[in-house]
């Protein structure tokens, strides 16, 4: 799975809580969100440092706008991230309720380890192996 296809699939399956997500789909989407956060923070720092000496009152308005847009971007990506994490747990043949581990501090470390685990080979109760589907798509594209 490529970087762009993983992002497209995460948005396409944002409200799909069934099925499985491969490691590449999950980690490419995490990388995309990390890049997005980096860009948003860079814009906010740039605006703060370049407009600090402005006495027009524009700076608080622009900072407020950038904080609002950053919050909106975060809000928009909560559902796809929740969905792909749940489907990633399914890929390891684990129930989705394990996502609730993120509520406790050490639970995030446990979830991180679960996200690193390889897929369950073959089909499991949550659906077919996503690697098999990726191989079929790749073979079809090569023809």
Task: Name the predicted role of every residue range.
Residues 1-4, 58-83, 95-117:
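Selective recognition of hydrophobic, aromatic-rich stretches within alpha-helical transmembrane segments
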Residues 1-32, 81-97, 114-143:
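Membrane-interface extramembranous regions at the lipid-water interface
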Residues 33-34, 105-108, 133:
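Solvent-exposed loop/turn segments at secondary-structure junctions
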Residues 37-38, 108, 120:
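A short hydrophobic/aromatic micro-motif that marks alpha-helical segments and, especially, helix-coil
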Residues 37-78, 142-143:
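Membrane-helix interface segments in multi-pass membrane proteins
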Residues 44, 48, 105, 114-117, ...:
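A generic structural signal for secondary-structure junctions
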């Amino acid at each position: 799975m490529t970087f762009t296809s993983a992002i497209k699939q995460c948005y396409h399956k944002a409200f799909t809580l069934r099925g499985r997500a491969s490691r590449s789909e999950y980690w490419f989407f995490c990388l995309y969100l990390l890049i997005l956060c980096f860009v948003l923070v860079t814009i906010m720092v740039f605006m703060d440092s370049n407009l600090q000496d402005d006495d027009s009152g524009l700076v608080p308005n622009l900072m407020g706008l950038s904080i609002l847009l950053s919050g909106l971007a975060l809000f928009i990506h909560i559902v796809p991230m929740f969905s792909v994490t749940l489907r990633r747990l399914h890929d390891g043949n684990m129930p989705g309720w394990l996502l609730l581990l993120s509520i406790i501090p050490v639970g995030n470390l446990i979830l991180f380890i679960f996200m690193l685990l390889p897929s369950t080979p073959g089909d499991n109760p949550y659906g077919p192996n996503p690697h098999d589907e990726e191989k079929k798509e790749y073979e079809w594209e090569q023809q």
